[in-house]
Amino acid sequence: MTTRVAIPDLISPSYFPAIAAVELGFLPDAKLELLYPVTKTYEELREGRLDFVGGASHAVLYAFKDWQGARLLCALAQRMYWFLVVHRKFNPKPGDLTVLKGLRIGAAPGPVDGLKQLLKRAGIADVQIGPVPGAVGEKASFGLMAAKALAEEKLDGFWANGMGAEVAVREGVGTVVLDARREGSPEVKGYTFPALVCSEKTIRERPQLAEAAIKAVAAAHKALKEDPKRATAIGERLFPAMEASLIAELIRRDTPYYQHGIALKTVESMNRFAQDLGLLSRPVKYEEVVWTPD
């Protein structure tokens, strides 16, 4: 029986440990699928059409009210993981969010929550946040579409994954204004993180599969830490040539955040964020959010 694993962005470092878990054979009989945006990915999990999703942890709440029916299994990496990139013609400076006033910024459903909240906290208004031109359909590669739209000046900036940011910078089009994982405030870093998620039904009926998935991510973390170049061979199978040549370096940068455990404080900060957004109606306990094998 095939195990269906879906992620909302493929040509990206964001969910790469899930990609590696499948492609390196740590989760036997697993098939990887791309299903964008993450809100749609979690709806498919809720409807029983997927076994596991790698996605933004807080976005589970778009499909599972107050965490009822789903659980986080493990972290694919720690901290919020998107980049804010602005076109160079605006002369943006790293860390200076005031440059965004009046600009058109592209962001995806789910990830956009983190951008809106950090701008609210910084007191930055008058930013036009909307979808990325071209990022439509379930197979969209959001970061690459964002970098393309920026180069074509269909956008003034974007909030997207590390691959989109790297491409925009290397092409001389964009400047990274904020790397949330490394430069955000402690609150911002704690808004969300990439997680592996499954339904309560899977945990109830096939707990051994859920446990195997956690072990597969841990094994992928270990393999990528030992040799980030393993990512290149995977990229060559799944990515366009340029992005395949970049992925190992992006993974090398991310390996310090490759810890699969989910701490209590991580859940607490994520749930505060979700409550601020109105996605979570009440405080919930750690065990209502995270499944831990016996």
Q: Which ranges hold each PLM region?
A:
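Conserved C-terminal helix/tail region of periplasmic/extracytoplasmic solute-binding proteins
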Residues: 274-294
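Short, surface-exposed acidic
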Residues: 29-32, 126-131, 239-252, 281-287
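A structural signal for short loop-to-beta-strand junctions that line the ligand-binding cleft
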Residues: 3-7, 69-76, 104-105, 179, ...
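Pocket-lining segment of extracytoplasmic ligand-binding domains
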Residues: 139, 145-236
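Pocket-flanking alpha-helical
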Residues: 17-20, 36-70, 82-90, 116-118, ...
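Hydrophobic/proline-rich hinge and linker segments of small-molecule sensing/allosteric domains
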Residues: 73-94, 189-205
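Secondary-structure end/capping motifs
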Residues: 204-281
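Bilobed "Venus flytrap"/periplasmic-binding protein-like clamshell domains
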Residues: 2-25, 30-35, 82, 91-167, ...
